[in-house]
Amino acid sequence: MTTAAIRGLQGEAPTKNKELLNWIADAVELFQPEAVVFVDGSQAEWDRMAEDLVEAGTLIKLNEEKRPNSYLARSNPSDVARVESRTFICSEKEEDAGPTNNWAPPQAMKDEMSKHYAGSMKGRTMYVVPFCMGPISDPDPKLGVQLTDSEYVVMSMRIMTRMGIEALDKIGANGSFVKCLHSVGAPLEPGQEDVAWPCNDTKYITQFPETKEIWSYGSGYGGNAILAKKCYALRIASVMAREEGWMAEHMLILKLINPEGKAYHIAAAFPSACGKTNLAMITPTIPGWTAQVVGDDIAWLKLREDGLYAVNPENGFFGVAPGTNYASNPIAMKTMEPGNTLFTNVALTDDGDIWWEGMDGDAPAHLIDWKGNDWTPESDENAAHPNSRYCVAIDQSPAAAPEFNDWEGVKIDAILFGGRRADTVPLVTQTYDWEHGTMVGALLASGQTAASAEAKVGTLRHDPMAMLPFIGYNAGEYLQNWIDMGNKGGDKMPSIFLVNWFRRGEDGRFLWPGFGDNSRVLKWVIDRIEGRVGADETVVGHTAKAEDLDLDGLDTPIEDVKEALTAPAEQWANDVQDNAEYLTFLGPRVPAEVHSQFDALKARISAAHA
């Protein structure tokens, strides 16, 4: 095939991969873009796009002295978060999508979306974005190509992935890649003026597990449009992982170094906006302990001879801005200091800096809010959207672990599960074994957050392994993959712990200070792994004793810590019915091991409650 078949191609195609060229040519006929551009991933390209988007009104260049090479985007108010009701797993059989996903027949969905895709890039440029998941040095990397009509997405992809010519070279003339289609769904007729944030009221985010394809339409926001993120790194990768014998998980990866210089690696799964990023970038409050970040959101876990190893498939942080400050997350703030950051839906100060709720200091007397309106401290609405974001490269972080770029990953010593529970769940508990830990993860529940556009904030929702919106196939089979991995790994598998930073007293106060003081919990986790401390036996497992936590210099009353470490049997009993119904909801493919572990939990609750 010749490149002439790609109508509107700018210059020569920098690849001889026939599958890729044919796919692009077909997409051009469907989308009908004005031009087709292969991105190279260079700084010059990023700068050029930024200039164009500033001119178009999509981006605002921030104060060069305060935020060098940084920009603010304001999305359409209808396009501010993941849209779970419009997210589909289009497996051939409905039961393979399972009860936690929206399903549609693949061909019917492709027919439906093709109607929307037809001509949807008129008047726009189609960008060809090759990208690599994880370090580009991986001898057998997972690759992808996204076709998009959004420059904002291209700029975000340069931060969030290893993208451009290097990734295209990795694909080579015959390499395979995940095909990702994305259009904001806002064609331009000749002479029609563009809007600052093109999008469409009709939205689809669809994954095709059998063919490893991702099709997205109508949204320019984050995880709906940056298809390497949740769509590939979790939904499609979880399918690949099941087929190939590994795990794709919604987990941070943290390197913790004790005063003697020994390093430990922890993976942790928390629902969105439950402190995952803050833990990934923790600054320990215990003298002599330091931490480094390998990843803040996603971990790919593979068995090697001596244990379970984790790689971060991403290249950047896409963090929730509100609440981030020099007290809660100094590393995130310092990561943004050199600039090179893309902000979305935060507020703009009069001197060209950014601001959000929970930032250090008092709110400025005047701001422009995320909708572009004047804002003062007397205003009724938030200046920044609750799900506003910063997007910045990991290697800019002062706490980036050098292993972040090691394709073999880091050996995981412990896995943490944790949500946002005001009661019931103690501060930290070690599970009995891998099977017990799998059941605990399967029944993880948390309060709702603003990261989903449709959540009722504050209600409790089940979130198995914090993967509920991201499991790309049947959730029962996903849990089976956990059991299978444990059977394969045996005693090489890491210990699993359940944590809860969010326990409250009767008057509503938090019983645990959280943030940097969570290092005290991590130290106990390591002490348990090393066999240095005992534990209380509670209904949920081996729960820490207050006297075994390093509480030196902590202002929190010891009574609060002790209360945070309780696992009241009557509260666990209140959850039994709900948990039983949830396991039933997950369906007949839930492993027998999970059911037997739940039966054992019920027996412990009954015995303690008697």
From Swiss-Prot:
Its main location: cytoplasm. Catalyzes the conversion of oxaloacetate (OAA) to phosphoenolpyruvate (PEP), the rate-limiting step in the metabolic pathway that produces glucose from lactate and other precursors derived from the citric acid cycle. It is found in: Cytoplasm. GO terms for molecular function: GTP binding; manganese ion binding; phosphoenolpyruvate carboxykinase (GTP) activity. PROSITE patterns: PEPCK_GTP. GTP binds at A273, C274, G275, K276, T277, N278, R389, R420, F515, G516, D517, N518. One of its GO terms (cellular component) is cytosol. SUPFAM superfamilies: PEP carboxykinase N-terminal domain, PEP carboxykinase-like. Signal peptide: none annotated. Binds 1 Mn(2+) ion per subunit. The keyword Manganese applies. This is Phosphoenolpyruvate carboxykinase [GTP]. It catalyses: oxaloacetate + GTP = phosphoenolpyruvate + GDP + CO2.
